Amino acid sequence: MRVFIDADACPVVSIVENISKKYNIPVTLLCDTNHVLTSEYSEVIVVGAGADAVDYKLISICHRGDIVISQDYGVAAMALGKGAFAIHQSGKWYTNDNIDQMLMERHLNKKARRSSHKNHIKGPKKRTEEDDERFAQSFEKMIRMAVESEM
């Protein structure tokens, strides 16, 4: 088992590394040339800056039983299709039971944004310690489940 992080602007990299160290699970950070990262624990793979290049690279190297961390529903859907586990940086698990609805909501929201002529889209709220704790608990629970499923 490995953990793969769609690491462009991902706020939970250090949390993932700390928890993964406890379980001796290798971590791979994937980023494009606009977001070069370094890590003492994780392998870092830098991909060209093309649209979705990081996403496609991540999916090409993840396998059944791996854990994928991404805020991209499309990446999560492809990871689930390969038998990997997938989690959002909020701690919400992507599952085969919820991914179709999430993709449909994303599509409808994108359609609504296109038709509304609004140019400004409000960004996410500032991340809190509670957000980090929620993610850490959810991620650790996912690791335990993934380890059990390997047995």
For the regions a language model picked out, list residue spans one by one:
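Nuclease catalytic cores that cleave nucleic-acid phosphodiester bonds
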Residues: 2-151
